[in-house]
Amino acid sequence: MAGKSFMTPAIMLAMLLLISPETYAGHDYRDALRKSILFFEGQRSGKLPPDQRLKWRRDSALRDGSSAGVDLTGGYYDAGDNVKFGFPMAFTTTMMSWSVIDFGKTMGPELENAVKAIKWGTDYLMKATQIPDVVFVQVGDAYSDHNCWERPEDMDTLRTVYKIDKDHSGSEVAGETAAALAAASIVFEKRDPVYSKMLLDRATRVFAFAQKYRGAYSDSLYQAVCPFYCDFNGYEDELLWGAAWLHKASKKRVYREFIVKNQVILRAGDTIHEFGWDNKHAGINVLVSKMVLMGKAEYFQSFKQNADEFICSLLPGISHPQVQYSQGGLLVKSGGSNMQHVTSLSFLLLTYSNYLSHANKVVPCGEFTASPALLRQVAKRQVDYILGDNPMKMSYMVGYGSRFPQKIHHRGSSVPSVVDHPDRIGCKDGSRYFFSNNPNPNLLIGAVVGGPNITDDFPDSRPYFQLTEPTTYINAPLLGLLGYFSAHY
């Protein structure tokens, strides 16, 4: 990109950030934050609490785990289906916790709702790890579920329980689960010390299991988890990620030593430009770099170097960018729904900018340096795109703004609710709602869809699942972003 222009990278970057198709009005980030948290109530599985705010949802999957003799009710459906996938659920919980840890003070009255959303996830993860050296990683058969279009309250598809254990390794899921529990223990450290200790103790046990019985669940449970949440990147990053969060939560030297000792073996320098439910490398580098920037951990210096390189790779105009930008200014990266990359990478930009600000540092990026303010502006531009500053002139968050997706790929949202249609709607009976051109009858407020790609185009149609399906891991990093921007803009 830089080689094709006479402009310096800094000028090109400024143009991308400041020039848009037209002048847009400001955004109500507080309203967007409220709605982004509310979305998680629409994804709840199990028996709903009295304070449930999305009233069109009802109890579902109340016998989950019974076939294995355990209680696995609760937790979250990952997206527009009715399967509970443990890997993305754990990552979602980790990212909600990180959002609260770093940006909770800016969330105002929505902080407690964010904490409730985290606890809905951790309560389930505690159930999933109740047996030593076992993690229940999935409830539901994805193939039978995806063959039906029915609301969760009616579902009669297989609720098969899948687990990892000593003979069926799954270090990536166990490592991420340990990270989620450890991160959440920080959230509850002062709010509920007893619960916080339970979370940290369980995280410690699950991490020990993850590293003792190393292996990928994509191998041991291939038929169940692939191609849905196959771990394409290997389990090594989740071991470092879990250790990093346990070190942050416990301050124990053993986890610091694990990170330093294993950073080469566990490929800490590999794929450092990636971050999401499958790949934690960029997140590890940003998280660990905070200690380096505080002057407390020179032994983690290589992680800061990786973090700097990652940050530079996101900036438009750099010689070897790891992402593209659409004409409308959207960050675009291949692999699944694009908004998962937009929110997770923007979260790291904002988080790192804050770490740099407190240390009075900048990021060297070849012929120019990136200031914390610049990183924040890049992140804000992405959030504003989601909220409506884009060529389609629409918000990609359901219920925010005057124009937003109406026909999202989501079973519960698109099929009439049990409130309006008490009679059961069976597996294939829901197909007419999937193919309908009518808007979804139930607003899944706060849901952020997969969104457009490099063309900035968006077909508001359920069959385009990569574009119109929301996921929990799109929204989770957004909590921190919206919390920060609601307090500072």
From Swiss-Prot:
The keyword Phosphoprotein does not apply. GO terms for molecular function: cellulase activity. It is found in: Secreted. Pfam families: Glyco_hydro_9 (PF00759). GO terms for cellular component: extracellular region. Its EC number is 3.2.1.4. It catalyses: Endohydrolysis of (1->4)-beta-D-glucosidic linkages in cellulose, lichenin and cereal beta-D-glucans. SUPFAM superfamilies: Six-hairpin glycosidases (SSF48208). Keywords: Carbohydrate metabolism, Cell wall biogenesis/degradation, Cellulose degradation, Glycoprotein, Glycosidase, Hydrolase, Polysaccharide degradation, Secreted, Signal. It comes from the Eukaryota. Residues 1-25 form the signal peptide. The active site is at residues 81, 409, 460, 469. One of its GO terms (biological process) is cell wall organization. It is an enzyme of class 3 (hydrolase). PANTHER family: ENDO-1,4-BETA-GLUCANASE. Belongs to the glycosyl hydrolase 9 (cellulase E) family. This is Endoglucanase 4. It comes from Arabidopsis thaliana (Mouse-ear cress).
